[in-house]
Amino acid sequence: MWWRRHASKVAVGLIGFFAGVWGVGVGEVPLFDWDEVNFAECAREMRVSGNYLYPQIGFLPFWEKPPLFFWVQAGFMAIFGENAWGARLPNVFISALTLAVLYYLGRRWHGEGFGLTWLFLQGVSLLPSFYARSGLIDPLFNLFMLLATVCGAYAVEKGRLGWALGMGFCAGLATLTKGPVGLLMPALAVGTLLLFRRQLPRIGVLLLGGGLAFGMVVGPWLALLLQSDGGKLLADFWAYQWRLFSTPDAGHGGPWYYHLVVVAIGMFPASLWAIGAWRLPFRKLPAPAQALLWLTAWTLVVFSIVKTKILHYSSLSYYGVSYLAAWVWLYHRRWIWRTGGVLTGLIGLLLAIGTLCVGVIMHFWPRWIQQIKDPFMQAAIQNTPLDWEGTEGWPGFVLAGGLAVLYLLPWKNTGRLGLLGLVCLLWEALMLRQLAGRVEAYTQAPLRQFCTEKAQEGALVWPVGFKSYIPFFYGQMSPDASPAVVGDTDLFQQKLLAGEMPFPVYFVSRVDRYKPFQEAHHLEIVEQRGAYVLLAPPYRGPGQAGK
C-alpha cells in the first residue's frame, strides 16, 4: 500500500492533524476548577514571585505537586499569556509528541503499519483526545513514565548501562512532574519483567544506572528544597501522598472497579477492540511491549487499591489499551467486525443518543428542576440565563450518521478504521464546543465574573464555605494581598473576616453555604448571580469594600 512506502510522512501528517484539531479553540472556554485553575495559578505565581524552586498557592508553599510541569506551563504563559491558552497549549504539544513516540515504538517493535495504527487509535480515543485539550499534569507525567518503562525494558533485554541510565533519567523527570509514583509504576513494570524473563542478574545494572541517573535528576532539587525550609515541605508532601493512597481524599471515593469502567468508556473505541487481544502471544512480544502491558496491568491494580478515585489516575493505562487495540486490528481483524463491531456500534449508538438527549432534557428543565435536591445545582440552573432550544445535542447525529455509513458502505478495512476514528474525533470536538461553555456557565462562570470584575477595582475576592482556586487565578491575586502576608491561609481568612487587612475585600460563597458566615460576621449581600453570592463586610475601614 502507498502509505506503507511513505509511513513517516503519513505519521507526521496525522500528528499535525491531531495537534490542529486539539489546538482549535483550546483557550476559548475558561479553565475549570479545581485542577486546571490550580495548576495554572501555580505557574502564574512562579512568574509573579520569581520563585521557581517549588509551587505556591496564595504565595505560600504548595506541597501537593513538584514543579516541573509548572515550569513548562510558565514558559508557555510567557509566550501566550496568563490565560486558558497559555495553560492548555502545553498539552497539545505534549500529546502530539506522545503520538510521535508511539509511532516510533510501534514501528520498531512490529513495523510501520503497527506504528501508524497505534498512533491513530490513541489519538482518536475519547479521554486521550480530551486530556490533550486540558491543562492537567497527566499527559507529561504519563509520557515520562512510558519512556522510563521502555528504557528499563531494554536494559533488562540487553543488559546495557545506557538504557538503565535512561530509565532513571525519565523516572526522575516523572517524579519532578507529579511525585514518587513516577518511579513506582515503571519500577513495578520493569521489576515484573525481570522476574517474567528470568533476568534477575541484570538487576544490578538497573539499580546502578537507574539509581545514579534518578539521583542526578531529583537530588539537586531535593537538596535545594531541604536547604530552603529544613524539610517541612517534603514532610507535608509525603503526608499528602499517603492520604491519597489510604483515604478517599477530597471526597473522591469510589468502588474498586471504578477505573475499569473509566478505561472501558474513556478509551472508546480502542477499549472495545482491545477485548479481542485475549489471543495475544504475550511471550513472543518484544521485551518493551511486555513491559508496557505489565505497566497497564499495574496501573489498574494500584489505582483500584488506592482509596482516592479520580478520573485521570488510570490514564497511564491508555497506552497499553491502544496497543492491544492496534494488535487486534492488524492480527485478529475477524474479531473486529464480529464481536468488536457489534460492541462498537452499540456503545457508539448509546453515546449518540445520550448526546442528543442533553439538549432535549435541558430544554424542559422547568418541568423537572424541583426534583433536584441539591440547592446549588438548582440555583445554578434556575438563575443562569441560558436558552436551550433542544437541538444543542446535534453532534450526536454526527456520531450516529458516521456509524451508519461505517456499517452500510462496502469500504475497505483501512477506510473503515479512518472513518470511525474521524467520526469519534469530530463528535468529541463538536460536543465539547457545544456543551463545555454551558457547563462552565452553570458551575463557575458567576464566580469567575465576580473575581475578574472586582480585580479591576483593585479588590480581593475571597471564597468562604467552599474551596476554589478561581479567586486566585482570575482575581489575579498579588503577593501583598494574599495569605503570604500572614503566613497561613486560615489566619488570613480570619483577618479578612475581622476587617484587619488594609485592602478592599469581598467574600463569595455558594447559595447553600453563605448564611453562617453572613450571620457570624454581619456580611451584606451585594449580589447573587447563578448559584453564588457576593458578600461585603459592613465596616467602614480604610479602603474596605462596603465603604
Please report, for each region that a protein language model flagged, where it lies by residue.
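Membrane-integral, polyisoprenol-dependent glycosyltransferases
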Residues: M1-R338, G390, F472
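Membrane-embedded architecture of ER/inner-membrane glycosylation machinery
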Residues: L165, L280-K547
